[in-house]
A protein has these predicted regions:
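Gly/Thr-rich phosphate-binding loop signature of adenosyl cofactor/nucleotide-binding cores
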Residues: 1-75
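Short hydrophobic alpha-helical runs that function as membrane-insertion/retention elements
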Residues: 54-55, 79-88, 105-113
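Structural motif
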Residues: 56-59, 86-87, 176-178, 222-223
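Alpha-helical segments flanking ligand/cofactor-binding loops in enzyme cores
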Residues: 72, 98-99
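Short, glycine/polar-rich helix-capping loops at beta-to-alpha or helix-loop-helix junctions
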Residues: 92-97
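Long, charge-dense
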Residues: 103-146
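Cytosolic nucleotide-utilizing catalytic cores of signal-transduction proteins
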Residues: 147-389
Length: 389
């Protein structure tokens, strides 16, 4: 399976015959690379956006102290790696520079002066460009397999080329990012996507992560649902350590028998996300965890759903809208606690008598008797249908 990101380690492998040597930061070889940049002074380092491999000849640097400052500035700008030309302006790399790159897991390479550094940059740029092309092809093909599954010509052969064999088993998981976070920080989801893909490239190569609108969609190959859950839990923990987890809703679909069926797994994962978003539940849930919702999602006619809601809890919704009351919320909480006034009061931080009054009022508005089990069940289903609209 081809990765969606190119790492500094892969780039290094492609130019080992150019007399380039890694002298520090070996643990950072898994870092993703976006592009290359010549950086000869600390001022230029401030223009870095993160993810670059920087190249320096040392021109303009008069001592080791200035070199250390330059390296620190490059690393603070979140570059993925540093290549330094030694021989003419920089005679050698001192211990302080090496130690700092090891501490920050920033790969530091040296190239002798007789080596044409421009050729290394050219190879890097070609590899990065090729990877971007492959990433776009994979992302587009996965999107087509999900949303235009009947058009196999739009995705089957393309995914095969990139290592996604059609008869392998696949499972889709969805990270749905809060739209408010998207509007206020578009770069957030980009950083999150990069962080996840970087993690997968190191720890789990049987999965890719692509972005479609405000969702990050994971495609796992030959991976059970329980294993997917375990991997996602580790990814969330990793992203939390990078302060990249905000309001994210996560769902896992069922494993499919073919790439042709990943649209089903996506639909299931997306259904879980809808429920999690409605309940503001940030836990990772599988499709099999949502119980009766699986049956309710199978109802295709939205008009039937709306009619049922209107006939059961519609009057409470309308009453709350006109009177700025909260009977809808209180009634649902009451049903979730199997009709316990005290548990409902504890959950909502209100007095038991207040709950009793509001439940009686709800019965009056709906013209029902909530002491009857079938009535409570019917209203509970209406609430669940309300969740999926």
């Amino acid at each position: 399976m081809r990765r969606l990101s190119v790492t500094i380690g892969l780039l290094y492998e492609s130019v080992k015959n150019h007399d380039i040597k890694l002298i520090a930061g070996e643990k950072g070889l898994s870092k993703a690379v976006k592009w290359v940049h010549m950086v000869e002074n600390i001022e230029i380092a401030t223009f870095l956006e993160g993810g670059e491999v920087t190249f320096s000849t040392g021109i303009g640097l008069s001592n080791e102290f200035e070199l250390i400052n330059l390296i620190e500035g490059i690393i603070k700008s979140k570059a993925s790696g540093i290549v330094i030309n030694i021989g003419l302006y920089i005679k050698k790399i001192g211990k302080k520079c090496i130690d700092y790159c090891n501490e920050t897991n920033t790969p530091l390479f040296v190239v002798l002066w007789h080596v044409h550094m421009a050729e290394i940059m050219r190879v890097f740029c070609i590899k990065i460009t090729e990877n971007e092309k492959n990433s776009l092809e994979i992302s587009t093909s996965i999107q087509n397999a999900i949303f235009y599954h009947e058009r196999e010509d739009l995705y089957l052969s393309q995914l095969e080329i990139h290592g996604f064999k059609s008869e392998n088993k696949y499972c889709i998981a969805v990270f749905d990012v809060n739209k408010f976070d998207m509007i206020n920080d578009e770069k957030y989801i980009i950083r999150l996507n990069e962080c996840i893909e970087n993690y997968l490239s190191v720890y789990y190569k049987q999965a890719v992560c692509v972005r479609i609108n405000n969702q990050l969609i994971f495609l796992f190959m030959n991976t059970t649902e329980s294993k997917v859950l375990e991997i996602l839990q580790k990814i969330v923990k990793h992203c939390e350590s990078k302060h990249l987890i905000k309001s994210i809703f996560i769902g896992i679909g069922k494993e499919t028998k073919s790439i042709r069926c990943i649209y089903k797994s996506y639909g299931q994962a997306d259904s879980v996300v809808i429920i999690n978003r409605k309940k503001y539940n940030n836990d990772i849930c599988r499709y099999d965890d949502i119980g009766i919702y699986k049956l309710l999602f199978a109802i295709q006619d939205r008009n039937v759903i709306r009619s049922f809601i209107d006939e059961t809890i519609g009057k409470v919704i309308e009453y709350d809208s006109y009177n700025n009351t909260d009977y809808f919320t209180v009634l649902r909480c009451y049903l979730s606690y199997n009709g316990s006034l005290q548990d409902t009061a504890n959950e909502l931080y209100i007095h038991r008598n207040t709950v009793n009054y509001k439940i009686k009022k709800s019965e009056e508005i709906l013209n029902v008797d909530l002491s009857k089990l079938e009535i409570r069940e019917m209203i509970d289903i209406a609430y669940k249908l309300h969740d999926i609209l």
